[in-house]
Structures are given as structure tokens and as C-alpha cells.
């Protein structure tokens, strides 16, 4: 599994990782690679965030990757996984997820926001969005600012895990997402 996008509240990264670890943590048949480094934060802030997500637990099947400074490195990352996760609750498009599906990767994608312009039941395992919450995190989203306002969809953890299990089954049948190549 590949988790993509710079770390932000609206992307539900923390909730995705915690739900994934609850179901698949230390099950070495599965691996979660997190390319969620946020270049707008200091390296130590990224490290603190990643540590806070998993707490004191030790997992053998998760890694947090640092910033990839070339498209070639990022492309290698996208090609290294069989399943991409796009669970953002406020996405304009989801370019890494879209690229991954176009590369023939299976995908677990929230059926909401900008994803709806390209993600279908045929090319992705669509998951339900959760409720809606205010977006404000006082880092990137400040109440009353002239931009980045509103609400985002939270993660429905049960739907997310169902989507992951469906993607695993699709991957077992054919490692290449033939519908993603269309």
C-alpha cells in the first residue's frame, strides 16, 4: 500500500494510518509506505507528526519516507506498491492517486470531492466519506482567512478497511488494475 500527499488534516492521513495499522499492523503480508512528507513543515516537525501517529507501538510493516527530490524517485515510489490510498476529505484532484491508477495500480479512494471526476467503481475501490468537520488546523487552515475555508469529509474507518480488503482481493486476481489503464 502507498499513502500519498503532503500531510494535512483534510487528507485524513492520521486516521488512515491508525485504521490501517489496527487491521494490518505487523501482518507482514502487507506493507504501508507513507510518502506524506510536508515540505512546508520543518523536517523535525514531520518526524514528530509521524511519531505521534503511531505512538509507542512498534510495527514491522510501515515506513515514513522523506521528501523525494526528483520525479524519477517519486515515480519509482508510485511503481513500488500495488495499491494506492486516496482518502482525502477535501481533495481538488488527487494527482499521485490518479497517476498510480493510470500506471495500473489498484486504489482505495474516497467517493467524494475532486476524486469523483475520475475515480469509478471500475477503476478503484470506492469508500464512503465520513461526516463533515471544520477544516481549521491553525497551521494551513485558519478561520477567517481569505482562502482555505470550510469543512472536509472525515474518514469512515470501516468503509476504508472494507475498501482495502476489496483492493487486496482485486490485486490477488490480477496485480495490474486493467481498468486503470483504460
Where do the PLM segments sit?
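C-terminal "capping" alpha-helix adjacent to the active site of nucleotide-linked donor transferases
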Residues: 131-175
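Short glycine/serine-rich donor-binding loops of glycosyltransferases
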Residues: 94-97, 112
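Aromatic "clamp/platform" in nucleotide-sugar-dependent glycosyltransferases that forms part
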Residues: 89
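Nucleotide-activated donor-binding/catalytic signature segment of Leloir-type glycosyltransferases, i.e.
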Residues: 44-76, 83
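Short acidic alpha-helix that forms the nucleotide-activated donor recognition element
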Residues: 69-81, 98, 102, 116
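Short hydrophobic beta-strand element within catalytic cores of glycosyltransferases
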Residues: 106-109, 119, 123-127
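Glycosyltransferase donor-sugar binding loop
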Residues: 29-47
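Conserved donor-binding/catalytic core segment of Leloir-type glycosyltransferases
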Residues: 1-11, 17-20, 32-33, 148
